[in-house]
Every structure is written in structure tokens, then in C-alpha cells.
Design a protein with these regions (language model features):
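N-terminal interaction/assembly modules
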Residues: 1-119, 123-134
């Protein structure tokens, strides 16, 4: 498993916990990084993702609302919503990763943490996001 994949997985765990708590993001990141024995590179990239998603959540949710036909954000499974936020951040704001790579990584995370059906769901929404960006 590559460093970026590990970092996305770490960011997902951190953002998942933060979704339903008022905990300090940096403390949660340090906790999960230590628990998973993440390297400094992995923790650094995960931190960038976490901070980017938090800082841009309103914009990310707006993009997701506009591209997730027939699905309100609050109806989505929590893990799917967070996977989508990370991907939309990478595709529309960060832009350091090729869109296809961000989508493929997100599909894999969704399948791992939410199931096969979630992978198809995430793929469909991110396909629309990517089409709206290019």
C-alpha cells in the first residue's frame, strides 16, 4: 500500500471521528497517526488533506450537493460522504494529484470501508464532479 493511500486512509479515519465530535483536529490526527504507526510523510500528507477538507467543507459540500443527483448529503453514509469530500478537495482545490488517481483511490477507500456498492456510488458522483471541473 502506497504512502498516499495510507495518508488518505488516515485522513478518512480522522475526518470520520471529527464528523461527530468537537475534538481538536491536530490531536485526533496525532492519535490516529501514532495508533497506525504512520510515517512522518504519511502523517504530513494526511494532515494536509484533513486541514484542506475542514477549511473548504462548505465549498466541497456545495459541489457534492450539485453533483449527487437524488442524494442529499445527510442521506449519504457518513464514510461515503467523507471519502467524497476528500476526493472533491483533491480534484477541485488541491489539484496535485491527477483526477483519475483521486477517483480510483476514493473508490478503493469506499469499497474497503463501506462496501462494493459504495464504490460504484462514489465513482458515479466523482465522475460528474470531474466532468464539471474540466
Amino acid at each position: 500500500m502506497g504512502k498516499r493511500h495510507q495518508a488518505r486512509e488516515l485522513a478518512l479515519k480522522v475526518l470520520f471521528q471529527l464528523e461527530s465530535s468537537e475534538d481538536d483536529p491536530e490531536e485526533v490526527l496525532r492519535y490516529h497517526a501514532a495508533e497506525g504507526a504512520a510515517t512522518s510523510d504519511v502523517a504530513h500528507f494526511a494532515g494536509q488533506l484533513v486541514r484542506g477538507v475542514i477549511a473548504n467543507q462548505e465549498k466541497l459540500d456545495g459541489i457534492l450537493s450539485a453533483t449527487s443527483e437524488h442524494w442529499k448529503l445527510e442521506q449519504m453514509a457518513k464514510v461515503d460522504r467523507i471519502v467524497l469530500r476528500i476526493a472533491v478537495y483533491e480534484i477541485t482545490i488541491d489539484r496535485h494529484v491527477p483526477t483519475k488517481a483521486a477517483i480510483n483511490e476514493s473508490i478503493e477507500l469506499a469499497k474497503t470501508f463501506s462496501g462494493e456498492e459504495a464504490g460504484r456510488f462514489v465513482n458515479g458522483i466523482l465522475g460528474r464532479v470531474a466532468a464539471s471541473v474540466t
